């Protein structure tokens, strides 16, 4: 499914994908949800998507990465959807941004994207500033979600740790061990996201406005502190 929004002359519009034509003075946000090769083909041709980037957004298994191309920049991130029992559910969210457009691609419902689409006023305000501001907004929401998950995990681990001190039974020890593995997996995801966020803090010709750099530095700081918090807890466990 493809949703396309444009902003020009102070007006936000939703466009029929079959009528899409790229215009220089118009900003675009294209959201691809569970899209296939045929759906992406027209978008690829209009926005000069590199074959490597196309391959990445068609896969739900691509690792977190940042890659600059001549016509645009691709950002692929693996986020944490939720944690069930001790299993981390990972999902991919892909971004491709160019001079006046942002393309998002995902295979699962995304709360931040759905919320933005259902809030035309918010979307209009972001697109008025430029498509890069939508990218910043969505990335910020993803890191916020990771911070919330980290806080929940650390609190659960502390509670299990206290329980083990009071009742050092095998079952509690196994629970503690499983939670440690979950923390380790979460840290690995966060380390990749932190490296990604760091890439966005450096001035380059990557089609992002330099005025956004301070905001990306804030996101990096939040991601870094989340990663360090997980490292600290794991260090205490193993130390």
Provide a role label for each language-model segment.
Residues 24-26, 134, 171-172:
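A short, structure-level motif marking secondary-structure boundaries and short turns
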